[in-house]
Amino acid sequence: MIAHLINTDLYGRNIIRLYLEYRERDFDFLSNATSLFLENVDRVLIVSCFPIPPMQIAETDGPPGALALYRTVEKLGGKAEVLTCKKIQKALKDFKIDFAQTPSIENYSLLISVETPGRAKDGNYYSMSALEIEVSPFDELFLKARELGIPTIGIGDGGNEIGMGNIRDLVCKHIKFGEKIGSVVKVDSLIISAVSNWGAYGLIAQASIEVGKNMIKSWSKEEEKVLKALVSSGVIDGVTKKPELSVDGIPLEVHKSFLTLLNSIVENKIG
């Protein structure tokens, strides 16, 4: 049910077709990612930042989900750090986050990407509209982690993010400009969702059910605070390209309703 909910395609980007075919290959992808997450929460590096062309300004999708995962790792007794761009760091400076600067991959038990660009087959990075974007090559950390056998989780919603290399053929089939923008970077466990923040929240909700403790319950109020802080610092909605209280063209109130429904599912499952 949670996997269906996080793939509610409100703005028709074909993620639902991608999701349905992906689920035929890996029916339990969310449960599998949750198991990997819960088994490796000792020291987690969470990566998030997606610049939107032409101004290359970071978007509101990704950082809220990254922060929610950061808080969840803390609740589970682990330690997390967030690797992101300077604009996001500045926006979230008052949220008591440990930001990684030059992380050594060997020090982490798990890497998670939430809406972070992954290189395409030509080595460049692209937006959903196939415009080239300027990024810090955070995906190199995931390539190295895979070489070292360090677990990796990728969360994405468009085909051009870290982890979408797992299903690049489906991205080419279902996503506009997929052949050009589709990431080749693979992860151990991939979560796809209609909004990447929702994918992160879905992971937290599934983890809550597994451990019998609701760790998503308070996030609705926190998300609003985070989004306001991001927008106040000039972070933009990736669809409207404006600094407003929305994510991927979806107003804050809809995201709050989504979290309310997700919370209800968790409460019903854990009693």
Where are the predicted features?
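Positively charged, low-complexity intrinsically disordered leader regions
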Residues: 1-43
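Short, glycine-rich nucleotide/cofactor-binding loops
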Residues: 21, 46-64, 194
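Structural motif
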Residues: 43-45, 109-110
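Histidine-anchored nucleotide/phosphate-binding helix
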Residues: 58-77
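Conserved mixed alpha/beta catalytic, RNA-binding, or beta-rich assembly cores of soluble enzyme
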Residues: 58-64, 97, 101, 110-214
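Short internal beta-strands
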Residues: 77-85
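Active-site-proximal loop->helix
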Residues: 86-100
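C-terminal functional extensions of proteins
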Residues: 163-271
